[in-house]
Amino acid sequence: MSRVIFMGTPDFSTKVLEMLIAEEDVIAVVTQPDRPVGRKRVMTPPPVKEVALENGIEVYQPEKISQSDDLQTLIDMEPDLIVTAAFGQILPKSLLDAPKLGAINVHASLLPKYRGGAPIHQAIIDGEKETGVTIMYMAPKLDAGDIISQQAIEIEANDNVESMHDKLSFLGADLLKKTLPEIINGTNDRIAQDDDKATFASNISREDERIDWTQSAEQVYNHIRGLSPWPVAYTKLDDTNMKLYAARIEEGKKGNPGEILETTKKAIIVGTGSDDAIALTEIQLSGKKRMPTANFLSGYQEDLVGKELK
């Protein structure tokens, strides 16, 4: 069994870690520090930390690994392999050079497309029909290392970030499991990326979350599902933020962008920049719980038709 240091943070990483624990000797786990979560700001450990502790594996949580005392500790462990999956930090060269089999990353896109921290979100927002997972050697430049293996998966019309996240986390763990024997034996492929074909998926900003109603209905729909259920697209009703969790396209209903054209028992119909509208079917107003739009409409007293979402 190979001695592996694993680095990752969110739920996406846990499936890869669980596979490595079953197949190899995971000698340490590195993850982000515990963070405050929710309205009450409760300090919460990363999902990867919980898996590691359940399996008796030592955990390191440097704020920035390149400036941490943990860096030399990890190098001194003399790992055979470093594996990362959604770790969230670029590793210093001294750490990349430490393992004799190299440092590899499980990335949730078909590189060189969608380098960066939000590849699942961006692929859906862009209306891509497929995405996938890449196993790659790590390099000092973000997501630019040589490709070892890739596997594609379809993005279906009703997929959102949550559903694709789940599919890709299982796919990533499975592809790495298939690829590991070749990496350990030194028989794996090593294909340089074409930097000219690289696209980028930067972390989602607050401004990225806001809906632009002048876009087409298809673009708005992709934007909503590409941010659902996190970090969530939003718009404004009067002066109140409205988060948008689910929607569908209403073909052949044209109106001014952002104008509420009608309400049904289950949806708010909103005009876009194309000849089709968007039906909002699951929402959350500021200070309220997430709910089906039907529940919101049953208790809302004002007439929404004619109001403008901004």
UniProtKB/Swiss-Prot annotation:
Keyword Ribonucleoprotein: no
Superkingdom classification of source: Bacteria
Binding site residues for (6S)-5,6,7,8-tetrahydrofolate: S109, L110, L111, P112
EC number: 2.1.2.9
InterPro entries, sorted: Fmt (IPR005794), Formyl_trans_C (IPR005793), Formyl_trans_C_sf (IPR037022), Formyl_transf_N (IPR002376), Formyl_transf_N_sf (IPR036477), Formyl_transferase-like_C_sf (IPR011034), Met-tRNA-FMT_C (IPR044135), Met-tRNA-FMT_N (IPR041711)
CDD domains for this protein: FMT_core_Met-tRNA-FMT_N, Met_tRNA_FMT_C
GO terms of molecular function: methionyl-tRNA formyltransferase activity
PANTHER family noted in UniProt: METHIONYL-TRNA FORMYLTRANSFERASE (PTHR11138), METHIONYL-TRNA FORMYLTRANSFERASE, MITOCHONDRIAL (PTHR11138:SF5)
Family designation: Belongs to the Fmt family.
Name of protein: Methionyl-tRNA formyltransferase
Organism lineage string: Bacteria, Bacillati, Bacillota, Bacilli, Bacillales
